[in-house]
């Protein structure tokens, strides 16, 4: 396991719900470009290239990073819960998309509700800025509840047919019961299925209206 090294060298927990990130070893912008300092490579091994096999070391490193992330969020959340006694928690930022960590926050810290907006990252800042400015100008007369994330465009069947024709694709039209059977069969045979219906989701997560489906039981689909 790499968790002890990550906790000691990269992400240290401090008293009072605080933490410290060692940017000398882990630079976000350099890492995105594929550059790591020698000390980081010494601790965790060489970088995996896109076409390299995924080894047990890679799996262990990913699992350890997930565990350290969860422990850090619990560390911060525990302090927040003690200070506020709040029973509801709202999260934002890219880390808020980590479903496993969110589940632990709710299960282990006593929050009754954990809310993550569908566009919790940078893209959601546009709507947040608009709402903040509206409230600041005292123009917000109604508090609108966001029932779901399906705020994007929606198209009718003539538009579907026109798009398929323009792309030179031949379509087969099936009733719902036969469609579901066909999709299940294709998934079981290791095929990818693009599921398209209704309005497009707002945010980076595919939530069933613009989704690529695959059988998670298959090793070659992971």
Protein language model regions, located:
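Adenine-nucleotide phosphate-binding core of ATP-dependent small-molecule kinases
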Residues: 50-76
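Flexible beta->alpha loop and helix N-cap segments adjacent to enzyme active/binding sites
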Residues: 1-56, 78, 82, 86-88, ...
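Active-site glycine-centered loops adjacent to acidic/histidine catalytic or metal-binding residues
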Residues: 94
């Amino acid at each position: 396991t790499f968790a002890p090294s990550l906790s000691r060298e990269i992400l240290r927990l401090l008293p009072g719900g605080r933490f410290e990130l060692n940017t000398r070893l882990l630079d976000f912008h350099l890492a995105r470009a594929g550059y790591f300092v020698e000390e980081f490579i010494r601790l965790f091994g060489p970088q995996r290239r896109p076409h390299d096999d995924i080894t047990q070391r890679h799996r262990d490193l990913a699992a350890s990073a997930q565990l350290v992330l969860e422990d850090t969020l619990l560390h911060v959340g525990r302090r927040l819960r003690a200070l506020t006694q709040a029973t509801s928690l709202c999260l934002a930022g890219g880390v808020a998309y980590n479903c496993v960590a969110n589940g632990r926050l709710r299960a282990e810290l006593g929050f009754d509700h954990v809310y993550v907006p569908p566009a919790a990252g940078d893209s959601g800042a546009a709507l947040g800025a608009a709402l903040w400015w509206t409230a600041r100008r005292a123009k917000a007369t109604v508090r609108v509840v966001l029932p779901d994330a399906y705020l994007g465009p929606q198209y009718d069947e003539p538009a579907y047919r026109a798009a398929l024709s323009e792309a030179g694709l031949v379509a087969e039209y099936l009733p719902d019961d036969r469609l579901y059977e066909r999709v299940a069969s294709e998934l079981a045979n290791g095929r990818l299925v693009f599921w398209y219906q209704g309005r497009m989701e707002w945010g980076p997560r595919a939530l069933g209206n613009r989704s690529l489906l695959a059988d998670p039981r298959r090793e070659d689909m992971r």
